[in-house]
Amino acid sequence: MNTGTAVITGASSGLGLQCARALLRRDASWHVVLAVRDPARGRAAMEELGEPNRCSVLEVDLASVRSVRSFVETVRTTPLPPIRALVCNAGLQVVSGIAFTDDGVEMTFGVNHLGHFALVTGILDWLARPARIVVVSSGTHDPSKHTGMPDPRCRYTTSKLCNVLFTYELDRRLDHGEQGVMVNAFDPGLMPGSGLARDYPPILRLAYRLLSPMLRVLPFVHSTRVSGEHLAALAVDPRFAGVTGQYFAGAKAIRSSAESYDRAKALDLWETSERLLAQVT
C-alpha cells in the first residue's frame, strides 16, 4: 500500500526521472507523480520506470501560471496517497536571445522560479505533515563567481539564485519546520547528459557531448543517476527528517552564496512574485 506521494516536476527525463527511479527503488510505500509538460513523454518515462501502479502522470506547464493552477486543482481532486514530498526540479536555459512565458515574464525566471513559486504556494496547504519541499538550484547561483557568461546564461544563474532566496524565505515563513514542512535547496552539480544543453546551438551541443566523458573525472561532476539518488534521499530519507533551511551540494549541507542570505532581497523576490501571480486571472 502506498502511504505517501512525492510530486516531481520535470520528471520525464534527466535528474527528475532519476530521482523518481531512486525514490521508487528505495521505498515501496511511495507513490510518485510525474509532473511533466509533455504527457506523452511522461507516459514513456512511467513505462521506463516499470512501476505503473505506483506512478501517475499529470500535465503542468511551468511557463503558464494558469497551467500551474490547473495542475494544483487536479492534484487536489485526484485520489492519491497523502502528499509528503514536493521536488521542484524542472528548469531550462535560454541560450540566445530572449523568450517570454504565456504570462509575459522572461522565460528563464518564469519557469525556474515563478512557476515553482506558484506551485509551492498553491499546494502548500494540501501537503500532509510532516512534509518536505526540495528546490533544485545550482552552484552557478553565486553572483560573486564571474563566469563570463553572456546575458542569456546569466539569466539562468540569476534564476538559480532566486531558487535559494525562495527556499530560505519559505523556510522562515514556515517557522523553520515548526509547521511540519521542511524545505531545502539542492545543487546536483554539473551533470553531463542531463539535457540542460538541449537548447544550445548545434556546435556547442556537439562540443558538450564530446567533452562530457572527460568532465566526469572532476569532483563537482556527477551522473544524473548519482544526483538523482541524492535528491531522492533529501526528499524522503529518514536521516534528513527535521532538516530544513539548508543548501545541499549532493548529500552534504554547505554554505550557499553570501547574497543568497540577504533577507531584504528574499522578501523583495517573494513580494514581486506575489504581484506577478496576482496579475494573472
What is the predicted function of each stretch?
Residues 1-200, 279-280:
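Rossmann-fold NAD(P)H-dependent dehydrogenase/reductase core
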Residues 192-215:
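A glycine/serine/threonine-rich, flexible loop-to-helix segment
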Residues 102-105, 116, 227, 266, ...:
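Amphipathic alpha-helical segments in well-structured domains
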Residues 100-103, 149-150, 204-212, 251-252:
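Short glycine/proline- and charge-enriched loop/turn segments
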Residues 159, 209-254, 263-265:
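C-terminal helical subdomain
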Residues 67-70, 74, 230-233, 268, ...:
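Alpha-helical elements of Rossmann-like donor-binding domains used by nucleotide-donor carbohydrate transfer enzymes
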Residues 258-281:
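C-terminal amphipathic/interface module of NAD(P)-dependent oxidoreductases
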Residues 95-96, 256-259:
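A generic structural signal for short coil/turn motifs at secondary-structure boundaries
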